[in-house]
Amino acid sequence: MAQLPLSPAPQRPETKTPGKPEAELIPKPLLRAMIGIALLSLALTTYAVLTGRPHEGVPAPGKVVAEKLVVLKDIDARHATVSDPEGNILLDLPEGGFVDVMAAAVRRSRAVARITDNPPVRIVRYDNGRLAMEDPATGWSTELYAFGADSKAAFERILDMK
């Protein structure tokens, strides 16, 4: 059987031509548009601050109808406990769900604020239907009703416990 001679591998032409610049990764008009959007955002924010424009999307104030101090402990990725300030366990949640997520959020805000202990948080129900969790140690708060009916119900159950 005769062997066919192997031809050399085809050579690729060089993609760079000497003396010719490479194609731009971000076209100049797009770059100018991005800078323009950033400057426009800065101008709008400056205008809003200087003219005293009221904040949008801020929850309406209300009177406190019920509140409870609880200690949330994030055991691991799923397990959370809820106790009163004296340390009595109110709920032990192996599948903590949203309560565990909120415990992790509180833990994170405290880590940022360099708070090492675990003081109680406030769960507060207002007369206008708002349900909030507030951390007096850091000033952090969240509107629990914004996460859906099931998530709100989990904290309403904690609030209504004796």
From Swiss-Prot:
InterPro entries xrefs: PuhC (IPR017495)
Comp. bias (Basic and acidic residues): 13-23
Region (Disordered): 1-23
The protein's name: Uncharacterized 17.4 kDa protein in puhA 5'region
Species, as recorded: Rhodobacter capsulatus (Rhodopseudomonas capsulata)
